[in-house]
A protein has these predicted regions:
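Short C-terminal tail/terminal secondary-structure segment
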Residues: 2-11, 104-107, 155, 219, ...
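Conserved glycine-rich cofactor-binding loop
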Residues: 18, 25-27
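The beta1-alpha1 cofactor-binding region of Rossmann-like NAD(H)/NADP(H)-dependent oxidoreductases
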Residues: 50-51, 71-83, 115, 230-231
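Substrate-binding pocket helix/loop in short-chain dehydrogenase/reductase
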Residues: 108-110, 114-122, 217
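Active-site helix of classical SDR
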Residues: 133, 166, 174
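Alpha-helical segment proximal to the catalytic Tyr-Lys
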Residues: 138, 178-183, 245
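Residue(s) in the substrate-gating loop at a strand-loop-helix junction
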Residues: 150
């Protein structure tokens, strides 16, 4: 074995790495931020809702981690550039960037979709990922970029043509950026399965516990439960760690074995 390869106990250690996580105030973004912090990373949480990211940052610090909240509109090039510069000004470098911010709009047939709804979905779920990638590449010497995708990006999902198109583009951006930025920066994706965040429940029209339980059965998940934000966080830790040092250009589906729907 190469003596320079990390010892098994160090494979998932992210101590000393500075991570930016967008959309980190709740749901999957919060789960990823918490997981990275638990692995030792310093985390910069970005989102539009200042109160939410400040609360998560405070909780990470209370648990012994280091975190900073930065209010950011991920669809604004200048704001994202300022986010990167703020992270570096506070912590000296940048080594992990997670493009998580996004939204799953209410399901609607493509033929009934307004141009405004299409543009808003693409801006948040596709263009923002591109902005994040090019910004991270500008300021990151070496490191890892993770793009949060969706099962909707790999096949047709009724009523989600706009969202699926954006996530398919995200998968393509992951592959293209990985080839362009290697070997300096690794670029990978995570495609979450059914994780009942508030965004997920709104998109699926789920309002009650009974409806949520019915949805779980309908998804027919082999692992027999919904996913959690921390399930996605665990995958993010792996992809950012030295355990994934030879992995780039991949989008990993984390869905408990269920097919996209």
């Amino acid at each position: 074995m190469n003596s320079a390869y990390p010892a098994p106990g160090e494979l998932f250690n992210l101590t000393g790495r500075i991570a930016v996580v967008t959309g980190a105030g709740r749901g999957i973004g919060e789960g990823i931020a918490r997981a990275l912090a638990s692995a030792g990373a310093t985390v910069v949480l970005a989102a539009r809702r200042t109160v939410e990211i400040e609360e998560v940052a405070a909780q990470i610090r209370a648990d012994g981690g280091e975190a900073l909240a930065v209010t950011t509109d991920v669809t604004d090039d200048a704001a994202v550039d300022a986010l990167a510069r703020t992270a570096i000004a506070h912590f000296g470098s940048l080594s992990i960037w997670v493009n998580n911010a996004g939204g799953s709009p209410a399901r609607m047939p493509m033929t009934q979709l307004s141009r405004q709804a299409w543009d808003e979905c693409i801006a948040l779920n596709q263009t923002a990922v591109w902005i994040g990638i090019v910004t991270a590449a500008r300021y990151m010497a070496t490191g890892s970029i993770i793009n949060i995708s969706s099962g909707a990006g790999s096949g047709p999902v009724p009523g989600s043509g706009h969202y699926g198109a954006a996530k398919a583009a995200t998968n393509s951006l992951t592959q293209t950026a990985s080839a362009k930025l290697a070997p300096r920066i690794r670029v990978n994706g995570i495609a979450p399965g059914a994780v009942p965040t508030e965004i997920f429940k709104k998109a699926m029209g789920i309002e009650t516990t009974e409806e949520l339980n019915a949805a779980r059965k309908a998804w027919n998940i082999p692992m027999d439960r919904f996913g959690t934000p921390l399930d996605m966080g665990a995958c993010a830790v792996f992809l950012c760690s030295d355990a994934a040092i030879w992995i780039t250009g991949e989008t990993i589906r984390v869905g408990g074995g269920a097919k996209p729907r």
